[in-house]
Regions:
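Rossmann-like NAD(P) dinucleotide-binding subdomain of oxidoreductase/dehydrogenase enzymes
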Residues: 86, 95-231, 235
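Conserved C-terminal structural/oligomerization subdomain of aldehyde/semialdehyde dehydrogenase
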Residues: 299-425
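ALDH superfamily catalytic-core signature
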Residues: 122-125, 129-137, 155, 159, ...
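A structural signal for short, well-ordered beta-strand elements
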Residues: 18-19, 230, 316, 339
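Flexible, glycine/charged-enriched surface loops at secondary-structure junctions
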Residues: 22-23, 91, 167-174, 247-254, ...
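N-terminal Rossmann-like NAD(P)+-binding subdomain of aldehyde/semialdehyde dehydrogenases
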Residues: 1-106
């Protein structure tokens, strides 16, 4: 079956998927969780093949970290699925109800987007999260994973599809494509695909946007910042910065740049640098930073770089305004944090930083659908339309207007025979 034939079949199955009951969709999730638990060994064998090939190909350690899908990660996605089951049904929610006239009622209800195409990177857990979120939200999904995870993705997809179909999910609501050239074919399916979600670099997202007529929800790279203000708790700052940089480096919500107020730098940087050394973090600093701690030179390009590694760029600033300007210029509008004890400074930062997530006194690693209580996420949207930040269930639904009348015609209202009352219900 070609990609176009897949997409066409999905479009036809989409209304059936949208009309599936809450019970059917939740049962599918439970069946998937059970199947993943029972077939861990099969998944790990497939993943080991991918890891061996990736090492032979000389892929970076950050890619290998993302690619690894061991028992711990499988247990993590199973827990995520079970948590997703407990969340409310995002479909058929009444968002607005208004009586336009005594026998003319307008209702706005949530409904699935339809057919979603997701192009994602080398993380196998992304396939599980995306497919289960789409099932829960009544969407059909066509998946294209990174070639590095081909064996793992194939094993996971077959397990997920078999389990979902066994409890009544339409077989044509889930498809996986593997070939690189399938991306171009998917981009041409604007008649059948309602939304594309590419996960990758800014360049990749821009390429997708420029080569398709399908609406795109962009998941960009993560050049996340922390600004350490002149008024702060030093111990708290060190704890937050170390977690943001080192808790897991190969992800888009890890901090890549640290901005430090010049007045607090002499007290903070030596203490922080010691903690960085203990975690094997390579520090790149501007000249004024190098005057306080021993580190490598930071270039202009470093402040535009998503390292996904144990590397951080450090710069001194003279005010919160300078920090904000730097973030808005060099950041990717993903997640940025201020560490401060001054409420007014924090409010200024929260108001003027133009990012999907703006944090105060907490790790940037919290930028995640699961940690927001969304169950999981299909990605982080840095755009401003429809969904922004971690895209969970609510970001995968749209709405429709239901208007119920009793022989009402517009001419009666134009000619004054009847009038609207616009009463909220």
């Amino acid at each position: 079956m070609t990609v176009e034939e897949m997409a066409k079949a999905m479009k036809m199955a989409s209304p059936i998927m949208a009309a599936s009951s809450t019970e059917t969709r939740n049962n599918a999730l439970l069946a998937i969780a059970k199947a993943l638990n029972e077939k861990k060994e099969e998944i790990i064998i497939a993943n080991n093949k991918d890891l061996e090939q990736a090492k032979e190909d000389g892929l970076r350690d950050s890619v290998l970290k993302r690619l690894k899908f061991n028992e711990e990660k499988i247990d993590g996605v199973i827990k995520g699925i079970n948590d997703l089951v407990t969340l409310g049904d995002p479909l058929s929610k009444v968002q607005l109800k208004k009586e336009l006239d005594s026998d003319l009622v307008l209702t706005r209800i949530s409904c699935p987007i339809g057919v979603i195409g997701v192009i994602f990177e080398s993380r196998p857990d992304a396939l599980v999260q995306i497919s289960t979120l789409c099932i829960k939200s009544g969407n059909s999904v066509i998946l294209k994973g990174g070639r590095e995870a081909a064996n793992t993705n194939k094993a996971l997809f077959e397990i997920i599809k078999e389990a979902a179909v066994s409890v009544g999910i339409p077989a044509d609501s889930l498809f996986l494509v593997q070939a690189r050239e399938d991306i171009q074919r998917l981009l041409a399916c604007h008649e059948y695909v309602d939304l594309l979600i590419p996960r990758g670099s800014n360049e990749f997202v821009q390429y997708i946007m420029n080569n398709t007529k399908i609406p795109v929800m962009g998941h960009a790279d993560g050049i996340c910042h922390i600004y350490a203000d002149k008024e702060l708790d030093t111990d708290m700052a060190v704890k937050i910065i170390i977690d943001s940089k080192t808790q897991y480096t190969a992800v888009c919500n890890a901090t890549e740049t640290l901005l430090v107020h010049k007045d607090v730098a002499p007290a903070l940087l030596p203490k922080l640098n010691q903690a960085f050394k203990e975690k094997n973090v390579l520090v790149k600093g501007t000249e004024d930073v190098k005057g306080i701690i021993d580190c490598e030179d930071a270039t202009e390009e470093d402040f535009k770089t998503e390292y996904l590694d144990l590397i951080i760029s450090v710069k001194l600033v003279s005010s919160v305004r300078e920090a904000i300007d730097h973030i808005n210029k060099y950041g990717s509008h993903h997640t940025d944090c201020i560490i401060t004890t001054n409420d007014e400074t924090a409010y200024e930062f929260e108001k003027f930083v133009d990012s999907a997530g703006v944090y105060r006194n907490c790790s940037t690693r919290f930028a995640d659908g699961y940690r927001y209580g969304f169950g999981a996420e299909v990605g982080i949207s840095t755009g401003k339309l429809h969904a922004r930040g971690p895209v969970g269930l609510e970001g995968l639904v749209t709405y429709k207007y239901i208007l119920e009348g009793n022989g009402n015609i517009v001419d009666d209202y134009v000619n004054g025979k009847r009038s609207f009352n616009f009463k909220e219900l």
